[in-house]
Amino acid sequence: MALFSFGSPAQRFAKKFNPLRDTVYDAGGMFSGSRMSADLAALQPLAEAVGAYSAELADLLWLQFVVYRKRQLHTEGLPLGQRALLMREAKGGLTPTERYEQHYALGESALEAEDYDTAVEHLQQSAHWAEQEGATLSLDQKLGIREEIGYALHEAGRFAEALVHNQQLLADARAAFGSDTDVRLSGLINNLAQNAYELDDTAQAQHYLQQRLALGQALKDDAIVLDTLFQQGVLAHEGGDSALARSLFEQRVAIARAGGDEDLIEEAQATLDELAEREQQNS
C-alpha cells in the first residue's frame, strides 16, 4: 500500500478545475482573462490524463471557449468550443436545451469571428434543438435565431439561400404575430430587400422596400420611413433616375422637419445636398 495517496487523475483535475469554473461562472465575479486562459491551458495535460475523450477534457475545453469569448477572442476560442461540443454529443446525454444553448453560443461566437459558414451550421443546429420537446424558448427567441441564420447566410455570400430562408421566415413571422403591421417585421423585410439587391434583382428589392415603407407609415415610425426612403433613393440614383431619387430625398427632409429632430433634419438635408452635388458633377 502506498504511504501517500494523491487521488485519481479525475480527482486531481476536479480539485484544480472546479474553483476556476466557479470563478468564471460567478455573475458578480471578476478575474484576469489572460491569467484564467493560462491557468486553464495548464490543466489540459491533467484532463487528457483522465481520458482523451473524457467529460473532464470536454468541460475544460468548453470553459476555455467561454473565457476566450468573454475576452472577445472568438477566433481562438471557437475551435475549442466546437471540439468540446463534439465530444459531449458523442457521449450523449445532453438535453435539447443544452444542445440549443451550446450550438447558439458557438454560432454567436462564429458571427463575431466573421466565420459565417460556421455560424450558419451552429445556428441551424440551435434552431433545430430549440423546436424539440423540453426546450423552453419563447416564440420571439425562436424567430430571432432564424433571423440570425438569414443574416449569416447573407454575410457568407449565400444570397439565394438567404432570400429563400427569409421569405419563409417572413411568412411564418406574419402568421405568428397575426399581423402584417408588427414592427418586428421591419428588419426582416429589410433583409429581404438586401438579399434581392445582392442578387441584382432590383425589382424585387424595390418590392420589399415598398412593403417596409408601408409598414413604417402604418406604424407612424419615422425611423423606418426615413431609412427606407433613403434606400429607395439610392436604388433610384443607381438606376439612373435622378428625379425620383431627388423626390425621395426631399420627402426625407420634409418628414424630418415635421418631426422637429435637428439631427435627423441635418442628416436628411446633407443627403439631399450630396445628391445635388453628384448630379452637378455628372452634368
Task: Locate predicted features.
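Flexible inter-repeat linkers and adjacent short helices
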Residues: 1-103, 283
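Short coil/turn linkers that connect adjacent helices within long alpha-helical scaffolds
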Residues: 49-53, 90-94, 132-137, 175-180, ...
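TPR/TPR-like (Sel1-like) alpha-helical repeat modules
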Residues: 242-260
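Tetratricopeptide repeat
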Residues: 36-43, 77, 81-84, 119, ...
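Residue signature of alpha-solenoid helical repeat architecture, marking inter-repeat boundaries
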Residues: 7-14, 55, 97, 137-140, ...
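Residue register within tetratricopeptide repeats
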Residues: 34-37, 75, 117, 160, ...
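Conserved alpha-helical positions within TPR/SEL1-like repeat arrays
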Residues: 25-29, 59-70, 98-112, 140-155, ...
